[in-house]
Design a protein with these regions (language model features):
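An acidic, Gly/Ser/Thr/Pro-rich helix-cap/linker signature
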Residues: 2-112
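Solvent-exposed, acidic/flexible segments
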Residues: 86, 90-101, 110-113, 132-140, ...
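Short, functionally critical alpha-helical segments immediately adjacent to catalytic or ligand/cofactor-binding
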Residues: 113-128, 188-194, 282-284
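Substrate-binding/active-site groove segments that recognize
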Residues: 135-156, 168-171, 175, 199-202
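Catalytic and binding regions of secreted/periplasmic enzymes and modules that target cell-wall glycans
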Residues: 175-202
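Primarily a LysM-type cell-wall glycan-binding module
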Residues: 246-275, 328-329
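LysM (lysin motif) carbohydrate-binding repeats in extracellular/periplasmic proteins that recognize
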Residues: 267-295
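Extracellular LysM carbohydrate-binding repeats and other cell-envelope/extracellular binding modules
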Residues: 284-321
């Protein structure tokens, strides 16, 4: 074949291919669904990473945070961003708060401890019976030796660190003693995390007695800011990107209590007598560490029994409707 013929065939081939490509593109434009662009534009508008403007005034236990100081401001911003973008963990904290904060609030009020201290439990344990690698346990992360020193029963059968009411009372006693020592609630709260000894040492070394002016261990330095970040997110979740339906919040446990001061050999049988099961009994009484109880001499235990219908989601939905109606009045 001569070179001119080859060039002619090659040119024809290229032209044919170009025409096919142009026709294909034209066809794709005809069938193009513009709604897909709209959907992507909407999604891009809804979700994007951003920073959050701090409120003009932020307090912890009615004590003002010095947000005019850049280091204070940046520390709070760090914890807010951490909370806002730890999606699943923070959602669970908000959902648990609906169940447990009423319990904690009542005990704080009874002891004249500021209401903001309830957010320390979120910083400590995310409102769960967490166990740290060091052995700190429960909502308030109490070490075994510290709990025993304050009269808590802690053994392989009963561990009162898992009891929300008793551990919150323990925390209140600590807060009050620390407040008496330091004269302000912010340092009292910080000492719960770092220990009074460590806080005292840094006060002596640095000649400062203001939490925001002290250089403390990283965990204690972040502690108050973390609690305040949870306070902001829990009280206004939608602003921080958490849209949670009321019915998705964990309901409060409904129960009544029975007094026990004698041996219980089998909590499964015990539960059946009250129309429930061991699983529900343990859910309400996580401080019972064994399926039996050998009580201490002259000690009475209050065991929670689920009220009728506590487990039903229908009751939860009805309660949420009542809450919304009350809220709208």
């Amino acid at each position: 074949m001569t070179n001119p013929n080859r060039k002619t065939i090659l040119t024809a081939f290229i032209l044919t291919g170009t025409i096919i490509i142009i026709l294909s593109i034209a066809q794709s434009f005809k069938s193009f669904d513009r709604s897909q662009v709209v959907v992507h534009q909407i999604l891009d508008t809804i979700y994007y990473i951003k920073s959050y403007k701090l409120p003009e005034n932020v307090t912890f236990a009615d004590e003002k945070m010095p947000l005019d100081n850049f280091d204070t401001r940046e520390s709070l911003e760090r914890e807010i961003l951490t909370s806002a973008y730890r999606h699943s963990s923070t959602i669970l904290i908000i959902m648990r708060a609906h169940r447990y904060l009423p319990v904690i609030e009542k005990i704080l009020k009874k002891n004249n401890v500021p209401d903001d201290f309830k957010y320390l439990a979120a910083a400590e344990s995310e409102y769960s019976n967490m166990v740290s690698p060091a052995g700190a346990t429960g909502f308030w992360q109490i070490m075994p030796e510290t709990g025993r020193e304050e009269g808590m029963e802690i053994n392989n059968v009963v561990d009162e660190r898992y009891n929300v009411e008793k551990s919150t009372q323990f925390a209140c006693d600590y807060f009050l003693k620390s407040f008496e020592k330091y004269g302000n609630w912010t340092l009292a709260a910080a000492s719960y995390n770092g220990g009074r000894g460590a806080v005292d040492e840094q006060i002596d070394i640095q000649h400062q007695n203001n939490y925001y002016d002290l250089l403390l261990s990283e965990e204690t330095a972040r502690y108050i800011f973390r609690a305040v970040a949870y306070k902001l997110v829990i009280t206004d979740p939608e602003y921080y990107g958490f849209k949670i339906a009321k019915e998705d919040l964990f309901p409060e446990f409904k129960f009544y209590e029975v007094k026990v001061d004698s041996l219980v050999t089998d909590f499964s049988n015990f539960a059946e007598k009250f129309g429930t099961n061991y699983k529900m009994l343990k859910l309400l009484n996580p401080w019972l560490r064994k399926p039996y109880l050998t009580p201490k001499t002259n000690k009475q235990y209050l065991i929670k029994i689920p009220s009728e219908g506590m487990r039903s989601t229908e009751n939860t939905e009805a309660e949420n409707r009542s809450f919304e109606e009350e809220k709208s009045r």
